[in-house]
UniProtKB/Swiss-Prot annotation:
The lineage of its organism: Bacteria, Pseudomonadati, Pseudomonadota, Alphaproteobacteria, Sphingomonadales. This is Large ribosomal subunit protein uL3. Residues 214-251 are annotated as: Disordered. HAMAP family: Ribosomal_uL3_B (MF_01325_B). The keyword Ribonucleoprotein applies. One of its GO terms (cellular component) is cytosolic large ribosomal subunit. It comes from Rhizorhabdus wittichii (strain DSM 6014 / CCUG 31198 / JCM 15750 / NBRC 105917 / EY 4224 / RW1) (Sphingomonas wittichii). GO terms for biological process: translation.
Amino acid sequence: MRTGVIAKKMGMTRLFQEDGRHVPVTVLALENVQVVARREQDRDGYVAVQLGAGSAKPKNLTKPERGHFGKAEVEPKAFVAEFRVSEDGLLDVGAEISADHYVAGQFVDIQGSTQGKGFAGGMKRWGFGGLRATHGVSVSHRSLGSTGQRQDPGKVFKNKKMAGHMGDKNRTQQNLEIVQTDAERGLLFVKGSVPGSKGGWLLVKDSVKIAAPKDAPFPAGLKSAANSNSAPTETPAEEVAAPEATEGQEG
């Protein structure tokens, strides 16, 4: 079992296929997704990787958070989450995951906080039909109707569907298809809609109901060494061309 990723919802667009069909997609961005910590069986009692994404100003962090990111030697992150993995799915602290972690045609489960709708009535929140438009109904056209029975049980049962706060719930959408990936820009294009508002953080994991493709990288799709912060190779002195003198400069 391999790790998921943290992605930011950027919005929706459409992609045209080779046969002329256009597919509605949600664009997800992977912003500096790095391993912040490891959880190991002998020390923590379970196996997981802790990922961080985005960037945060140090002045906006608490002292424990600054120490946590400093120990991992990664820049402060705006969002942190853990993903359970198998023993062979552990990653080194500081490793950065790219959009190549997923492949086109793969199915994923996406978890996020749904859009908040505020205080909503029964018709909007639960799809109630409401009361009649005429025939003696006044003012109560969009009301709930009856909420109980009679003297027995003499109460309204818990979890009765009523008006109340709607949305802003942690929800998971399953079996969403990855239509396309863009590793250079760190983008995932997912077919259809996903939970949450623009700019919200999402957890993207391999589908639990549909097996991942065999060509999906394991344990993860990491950014190549060429894109890392490693020091550039030194150029021999004899190969370095001397700068040419131009007008206004001393040769």
